[in-house]
Amino acid sequence: MNKTGIKALLAPKDCVLVLIDHQPFQFANLHSHEPTMVVNNVIGLAKTAKVFGVPTILTTVLEERGGLLIKGLQDVFPDQKPINRTFINTWEDSRVADAVKKTGRKKIIIAALWTEICLAMPVIQAFGDGSPRQLERNK
């Protein structure tokens, strides 16, 4: 049975957050929103997740070329090493999918800079796997 009304709202105890590839080179061609605003928003999202105890998975892609996570974001989780991927689709990296599943949380919140690739592909695949999810396009 589908939940409606207040029961349909996200609850921290049910959620896991996946922050995809918030690296300096990813911001280089970002023109849909002002980059500083996007940085502040994703850091705010990460801090909120941390305060509410929402497990957070960090990813990078081709870290050796694209750089580490943006500093403010890594500062929220100083002891956490991002999963450095080579796949375009985050969900195709079993380390990411397994990390999400390991949390036992049923609602996946995914935040990424590029909707067409970084966000859409893993969401479609996670949906196909039967995982409930919430999209968060950084803006």
Report residues per predicted region.
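Short hydrophobic alpha-helical runs that function as membrane-insertion/retention elements
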Residues: Q134-E136
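Cofactor-binding loop segments of dinucleotide-utilizing enzymes, especially the Rossmann-like FAD-
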Residues: V61, L113, N138
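Active-site acidic carboxylates
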Residues: M1-F87, P132
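A generic structural motif
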Residues: N84, N138-K139
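Internal catalytic-core helix/loop-beta-alpha segment
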Residues: R85-S131
